[in-house]
A protein has these predicted regions:
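Extreme N-terminal leader/targeting segments of oxidoreductases
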Residues: 1-18, 36-37
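A short alpha-helix-loop-beta-strand transition element characteristic
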Residues: 56, 79-100, 166-173, 278, ...
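Mid-domain catalytic core of redox enzymes
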Residues: 6, 237-346, 354-355
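Dinucleotide-binding Rossmann-like beta1-alpha1 core, especially the glycine-rich loop
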Residues: 60-148, 155-157
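Glycine-rich FAD pyrophosphate-binding loop
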Residues: 35-59
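Conserved flavin/dinucleotide-binding core of flavoenzymes
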Residues: 6, 320-430
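Active-site/ligand-binding neighborhood in enzyme catalytic cores
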Residues: 126, 133-238, 242-243, 254
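N-terminal Rossmann-like FAD-binding beta1-loop-alpha1 element of flavoenzymes
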Residues: 16-43
């Protein structure tokens, strides 16, 4: 939702308000919990609209999310906080289509999609022993409380998979494309805790799209919040325990400051060490009269080379994403942010022509999004995201991805937990 008009609204709030910097999911979740206890707050958002990474544009009847984003319905905190029915969630098929040696192979969860059992068994992704190891891994990660995964020993995912006996073939042809598609990490160097948690979530729920785009998630979180407590186009220049100073020079006082921004911005404002590197992506959208695939699968590049990381047809998943008679195609490229838009589009078309034939040249380019900080790197050891640290400084709190795990689940949970900590610290003064 575009809230640009809010920047002109009255800021005369009680002096004891909590100042939340950032109107992404973590900031909104924090505000909702504070509101339950009637704690005054104000949200300051640098962008002209809320949602953090979850933004959506509508162009000529096509719904374009800013980058490849999905909602995993098995996320515990998302199930608790969000109304899935109102979001109109539409699921991808449980599995993926992986391109290997110039051919497409359908890999599906045989328990949830039994009609694709034979194609899954026939796919040249590894040995029968590898398939049994996958089944064993799925059983192991689904035991007990999902949060207990973050108490396990941590190591790079590549090392973890090798320790479980997986062959080089299945690592290269299945796990690398899978992890590249989910975590933008084709070398699978990220935390094995993160990998195991993601693997569990994929096996327990659907990968889905809200019918009106990913921005609908933030819009739903915002609906219960007082509109005059959210101020967009308000970049914070500096913070201190008693308030913040905006880029405009305006000072806003409060009883506490909660940083709910992306990792690099949190580090800047808090004056702490910058987090590790970022995973960037380029997301290109095309319109076509005929889709390149007929089923609602994510298409992954398992060739070990090429520019394209993944391809989806959102309009097959949720018909609302494209006007009648058209389909929406989304293509993700990892990194390559130094290549200009025209060159990226030309190279992507050339590569996809090898995949799908000359009809790719008839696709109409709609828009290209460049996301420099699509995800932070997630090396081991990853901290337990269910445990929030106390205030970084007296009166200053941090929620969201900084020092934790990125993703919808953890943004919602960290926002709620940080609000709980603020409430606890404010209790003696109420």
């Amino acid at each position: 939702m575009n809230l640009a008009v809010i920047r002109e609204m009255n800021m005369n709030l009680p002096d004891k308000k909590v100042i939340i910097v950032g109107a992404g999911l973590a900031g909104l979740a924090c505000a909702r919990r504070l509101m339950e206890d009637d704690i005054p707050f104000i949200i300051l958002e640098a962008d002209r609209r809320i949602g953090g990474r979850l933004k959506t544009d509508t162009i000529d009847g096509f719904i374009l999310n800013h980058g490849f984003h999905v909602l995993q319905t098995a996320y515990p905190e998302a199930r608790r906080v969000l109304n899935y029915d109102r979001l109109g969630l539409k699921p991808f098929a449980p599995g993926a289509i992986i391109r290997i040696d110039g051919r497409f192979h359908r890999i599906a969860d045989p328990w949830r999609h039994p009609r694709d059992l034979w194609s899954t068994l026939a796919a040249p992704i590894g040995t029968m022993g590898d398939r049994l190891r996958i089944a064993r891994l799925a059983l192991n990660v689904r035991r007990g409380n999902p949060y207990r995964i973050f108490e396990k020993p941590d190591m790079p995912t590549m090392e973890f998979l090798r320790s479980k006996g997986f062959s080089k073939k299945i690592i290269d042809r299945f796990f690398k494309p899978f992890f590249a598609g989910v975590c933008l990490d084709p070398d699978i160097e990220a935390s094995s805790r993160v990998f195991q948690y993601i693997f569990r979530i994929f096996s327990e729920g659907d990968v889905s799209l809200p019918d009106e785009g990913m921005a609908a998630i933030a819009d739903q979180l915002m609906q219960d919040l007082p509109i005059d407590r959210i101020r967009t186009s308000s970049r914070v220049e500096s913070i201190h325990p008693g308030g913040v100073v905006l880029e405009s020079g305006k000072a806003i006082d409060g009883c506490a400051v909660v940083l709910a921004t992306e990792g690099p911005e949190t580090a800047r404002l808090a004056g702490t060490a910058k987090p590790g590197g970022s995973r960037g992506e380029i997301c290109l959208y095309f319109a076509a009269k005929q889709p390149p695939v007929d089923d609602p699968y994510i298409v992954l590049n398992g060739e070990g080379r090429g520019l394209v990381n993944s391809l989806t047809v959102p309009s097959i998943v949720a018909r609302n994403y494209a006007p009648a008679g058209q389909h929406l195609i989304s293509v993700v490229v990892i990194g390559r942010l130094n290549i200009d838009d025209r060159s990226v589009e030309a190279d992507v078309r050339e590569e996809l022509t090898q995949w799908f034939g000359p009809e790719v040249n008839d696709w109409c380019h709609l828009k290209t999004y460049r996301i420099v900080h699509a995800l932070p790197e997630q090396p081991p050891p990853m901290p337990d995201p269910t445990v929030r640290s106390a205030a970084k400084k007296t009166g200053i709190y941090v929620c969201g991805e900084y020092g934790s795990v990125p993703g919808i689940q953890w943004a919602l949970l960290s926002g709620h937990q940080t609000a709980e900590q603020v409430l606890k610290d404010l209790e003696p003064h109420r």
